[in-house]
Amino acid sequence: MALRACGLIIFRRHLIPKVDNTTIEFLLLQASDGIHHWTPPKGHVDPGENDLETALRETQEETGIEASQLIVLEGFRRELNYVARKKPKTVIYWLAEVKDYDVEIRLSQEHQAYRWLGLDEACQLAQFEEMKATLQEGHQFLCSTPA
């Protein structure tokens, strides 16, 4: 059975002008261990939790951002399937916008750095093709949805 994890692709954007979606920035976290890869906040599902509850809890634990500081967008949910540490893994992601552009990020010990990045930079740091594709799909979704 595949390991299951859930997370949020967190973004922020300047809303002036509203038609300009080139100002979208994604939040990526750099892991403290392993290959120090960059991903959105995510983590394993705890017993009794649903997937979205897991994503919100992990986001709070890893970034300090509370659910009340986010708007989870309807209509975007992506499932990534890959092998991690020789085991199959499934990760579910939703898109979530921070309500405050200057929200404070407080990293847990699991991560050593964070960056707000435009799509191209985010895709360069996201080493895995599935993650790059998901970021691109998220950006495309945002550009086709009014702010």
Curated annotation (Swiss-Prot):
Its EC number is 3.6.1.17. Residues 2-139 form the Nudix hydrolase domain. Belongs to the Nudix hydrolase family. The keyword GTP-binding applies. This is Bis(5'-nucleosyl)-tetraphosphatase [asymmetrical]. The modification N-acetylalanine is found at A2. The gene is Nudt2. Catalyzes the asymmetric hydrolysis of diadenosine 5',5'''-P1,P4-tetraphosphate (Ap4A) to yield AMP and ATP. Exhibits decapping activity towards FAD-capped RNAs and dpCoA-capped RNAs in vitro. Divalent metal ions. A motif (Nudix box) lies at residues 43-64. GO terms for biological process: AMP biosynthetic process; ATP biosynthetic process. Keywords: Acetylation, GTP-binding, Hydrolase, Nucleotide-binding. InterPro entries: Nudix_hydrolase, NUDIX_hydrolase-like_dom_sf, NUDIX_hydrolase_CS, NUDIX_hydrolase_dom, Nudix_hydrolase_domain, Tetra_PHTase. It comes from the Eukaryota.
